[in-house]
Amino acid sequence: MDIDARIKAYKFVAYSAVTFSVVAVVSVFITLPMVYNYVNNVKKQIHTDVNFCKVSARDIWSEVHLIKDAPGNNTRVARQAYSTGGAGGGGGGGGGGCDGCCNPGPPGPGGSPGKPGKPGKPGAPGAPGNPGKGASAPCEPVTQPPCQPCPGGPPGPAGPAGPPGPPGPDGNPGSPAGPSGPGPAGPPGPAGPAGNDGAPGAPGGPGEPGASEQGGPGEPGPAGPPGPAGPAGNDGAPGTGGPGPAGPKGPPGAAGAPGADGNPGGPGTAGKPGGEGEKGICPKYCAIDGGVFFEDGTRRR
């Protein structure tokens, strides 16, 4: 009996081990593809986010360069905002023009997105920076001169004729007519059919001799063929009219080359001196949990 019990126990242990092994292998076959798929999706998402950040950074840099390269003189201070001329960079505002006031044209169609670039190599660590300077007072805001309104353009051509309107409502009924009299006589009826031929009459007597008379001119004949072309006529008198009306406005020309940089402005006034910085303190000791204790009794993490 003891041997049978041991055999049953060994069989139970063997079956249990085989069962757990099969379950473990099946679990590995199921979980490995799921983990691989999850990691692949996370990798794709991170790659997409990195490309989006690169494209956004590239767009921001391009806009910064456009703003930096935009023509204009922004070095004037408030006292020069309303000047009408002068030497250096201040002379551009005295022409009375309105080049910067007109609205720009509609934006062009967006270009196709470029291919993502290859990731660059990590740069070398930079050298430690110099100690910062004290804060300077904010610059006085520059008041921009008001723009002169552009003159109104000529009236446009007349539009096409509109569609016909809907039919109007029915009119009111007319007043009743009075008693009518007899109408006018109708037109004569058509001629009746020809009658039968009559009996031949008796022969007549000899007639009187006819008088010879000269007939009048006949009707004019048809027009003959056109004759040869005559010699060229003399030049006409010069016209008295003025020049014709101006033609339509042509298409806008290509963008011109950027103008030369203006003369540098004068040096600005010195700013107010900044306040004194806080007194530096050294940490007294550092705690194990990351806190730092200073001599004044404060603690920072």
From Swiss-Prot:
Matching Pfam families: Col_cuticle_N (PF01484)
Gene this chain is encoded by: col-2
Compositional bias ranges of the Gly residues kind: 201-218, 262-274
Source lineage: Eukaryota, Metazoa, Ecdysozoa, Nematoda, Chromadorea
GO molecular-function terms, A-Z: structural constituent of cuticle
GO cellular component: collagen trimer
Protein name (record): Cuticle collagen 2
Alphabetized UniProt keyword annotations: Collagen, Cuticle, Disulfide bond, Repeat, Signal
Span list, region Triple-helical region: 105-134, 153-176, 183-212, 215-282
General function of this protein: Nematode cuticles are composed largely of collagen-like proteins. The cuticle functions both as an exoskeleton and as a barrier to protect the worm from its environment.
